[in-house]
Structure formats: C-alpha cells, structure tokens
C-alpha cells in the first residue's frame, strides 16, 4: 500500500451515550477510544492522525483508519482483530474471553531498530510510530501524565526541600501532549514553573485548557513574574515562547537559579520533535522533508547545548533530572560525555511506587458524561478511605483538570486496589449508577509493562535494564487473562531502539463475565510489575509480593 493518505480535513468525535454503533460494548469500546484519540480536544494534530509525542499516530493512514472503524463495527464477540503498525491486517476466530483487538506497533528486529530504518519504512507506508497510548487507543490528553508528574515533583520536594515547594520554581521545556502536564503538575505540587515552548499553538492549547496560567512576553518578563510569585508564595505557571537550547544557556550565563530543572521536549525524535536553535518551525518542517540527516544533526547539536546547560545547573547543586525523553542519550551521541550525570525521574523519585505495582491506572466514561467520572471519584474515596494524598489528588483533579474528549480520570494505585476499583466500577454499570460502560487502561509507563534503560528501567539494582522479556510477558499474560485489547509497542517515550512496552484496556460493561476478566487482568497486570522488581532484588517488591500472595517460584516459593 502506498502511503499518500495521512492528511484529511475532518473532525473526529467518539459517539456518546449508551446506544451501540458496534455489535457489543467489547467492540464499541475500542471504536470509541480510537475516535477519542483523534478528537481535536485530545490530539495534537488529528488531521494527520498524530495524537501526541512527535509523530505518535492512532492509525497508519486514513484508509487504515476507515477500515479499522468498519471492522470494529462488524466484529463478533468471538473474533479478534489484529492491527499491525496502525493497519488492520486480519480478523480471526478466537473466543468470548479473548481480546477483541491485538495491536503491535513500531516493532523492529533489534539490529534494524533505529530511526533511520524506521523513517524509511514510514515513508513507504510500511510502519507507524505508535508512541505509547497513541497507537493503543487509550490516550486521555495531558491528564494522563499529570499525576505522574505531580508525584515526581512532590517526591522531589520531599527529598530536596523538606516537603514543601512553596516559594520554589521549576524550569522546564516542552508543552506538547506529555510536556503540557508539567505546568499544572507543578502548580498542584505548590511550585511556580517556567515552561519554554517553541510552538505558539501549543502554548495557546495549554492556556485554553487551563494547564498553564499565563504567558510571558519575553525572558525578562518571565523572570520578573517568577520573582514576584515565588516571593508571594503563589504557585503560578508561566509559558514562554522560545527555544530551550537558547534560553537555558542564557539563564546559566545570567546566574539565574531555579529550584528544580527538567525537560519534556520531544527530544526522542530529532527529525520531528526538537527544533534546532536559530530555526523557525517552518524551516524545520520543510528541511525535514528535503534533508533529514542534516535536520537530525542540527537538532541533536542543539540538544547537546540544552543538556550542557542542565549539567551546569546541576553543578550548582540544583536538583536536575531527565523526564524520560532520551535527551541525555542524544546529547551523549553529540559529545557530551557526562550527559548521564543527572538521573532520570524513575530511579530518582518513582521506583518505590513501581515496586508495589503502583502506576498510572486510568479510566474513561464511554457515556461522555462528566457525572459518571465524578461518581467513580467518589467510589475511589469510599473504597480507599485512609489515603489522604490520593483524596487530595482527586479533589485537585476535579477542580483544575479540564476533560479532553471523553471524560476520564488518572489515579495512581497498585496491586490489590486496581482490581477492587475495577470490580466496583463494573457493579456501578450493572446497577445503572453509571449511564454507560467505562474502560480501564493505563499508560505503558507502568511498573511491569516496559523495558527502557534510559527511563523506566534505568539503573535497575541487578543490571537488567535492557532485558525486554518483561513487557512481552505482560502482554501475553493480559491476553491470556482476557483484556479487551492488548498492545505491544517499540520506541515509545525515548525513541527507536530504546524501549519496548505493552498496554492493556478492559471494559466494565456490568456483566458477570466482565467481572471475572477484570479480577484476573487488574490483578495480573500490576502483579507483573511487582514480580519484575522483586526479581531484580528490590526489598519493597519482595515484601509486597509476599503480602499480596503472589506465587513467584524463585522468591516466594
């Protein structure tokens, strides 16, 4: 298939309500979530099928999108659709407890797992970059990463500033689908933030959705606002239109001292996601078509300057960390030998949560009714009554987070609680308390579903950072357990050659059969995270495995 069909001037919006357009909720759910990924309120560039993260797409091209929709509409409850890099390639007879969709995106044999080969395949229409939740149809907008970013900032505040970020400020860059969560997360954590972004349209989107509070006119104005708000103890987020590779070195030169430094530009994809210093966005996109190798080189050279400035801040004793976009690797390849001197956010702040299977549990209301999410929020509080931190998160989320597309919620919980909540949501659908079924999924950034040596599995205790058996086992187990759709991807977050990861989504349709699947999947899925970390020798994970009764032959047996 030649690929000349990546642009369509159309607006997609998932159906709402409890009327089916497919044959059952098990096929209606992936249909609605695919469409929701391309809702203009959700996706970064929906007319080109781009959901987030550089070129993370929901379908390979519009012809493939149309055929996926058509196939899901006719799919029976004992059939499974296979999707290969955004292209529907087969429907096979399985059984009612099997997944309705199995997805494999961007996977390459390791020797060829690099951007150069992938871009050749992409240009020929033979591959699609699925990112993490773009090609697996469970992206919920920037909310999907807000709580993880919030938890990171809060933990950094505990470690470095005695538990309070009042009067402190975070310096970062990138206001895309992932980075757009940073300003709101910093505000919720009590800090001011200066958020650099090279595309004005991205800033406008974050202002419109209340993820960022204000835009400064220039660097001097931004610093004046930061000084004012930190002195007043206010947590206000400020956007600045500019290039981080130019602004961070200038801040170092001026002797400006942020209280925390990180970055969420799309550095994982130098051809499509990182604007070289001194270039306009239009130049960048035009030259990416005509001289891609030169564009990649220029972008990586700018990343090297950017990372050197981050290292300069770190040398001053300022907490500095990578937020999972592989910018350190890119800088190292351009000669910054000590690029990895500052840590990634997972080993620095998040791994103890992963050891207990705690990660980005999320759900979406297929009804389209915000009230359904508010009812589930209340149910979470009812079932987890003693977690004040979680209750505060839910309260802040309701107050500050604008729903994008179908109403959804993110809530970090772990082994034991995920199944408990899933079964409760299923019962709420059965009783009619919720007006339509809900889907439960997660980011691929989770405790047992990803191998990414420069991000989630950086600096593992036993040195197993690059072992990618774990996400494969996770995907296989979720398939065996009866998740509604399961995905296995390569290259999400950090780019080609640097990660493998899996995802799952399960439907709560109020039936007894769904309850059985939910109990299995929402126990097994976080259980693999506890297993993976216990196997690596983390005491927290070993203790959790024993407490939860996991059968790990080499550990609990």
From Swiss-Prot:
Active-site residues per Swiss-Prot or TrEMBL entry: 411
Residue ranges that the Swiss-Prot or TrEMBL entry lists as coiled coil: none
Enzyme class: lyase
Pathway stated in the Swiss-Prot or TrEMBL entry: Amino-acid degradation; L-histidine degradation into L-glutamate; N-formimidoyl-L-glutamate from L-histidine: step 2/3
One GO location term (cellular component): cytoplasm
Subcellular location as annotated: Cytoplasm
Top-level taxonomic group: Bacteria
Residues engaged in binding NAD(+): 53-54, 131, 177-179, 197, 202, 243-244, 264-268, 274-275, 323, 493
GO molecular function, one term: urocanate hydratase activity
Protein's GO biological process: L-histidine catabolic process to glutamate and formamide; L-histidine catabolic process to glutamate and formate
Cofactors: NAD(+)
Record protein name field: Urocanate hydratase
Organismal lineage: Bacteria, Pseudomonadati, Pseudomonadota, Gammaproteobacteria, Pseudomonadales
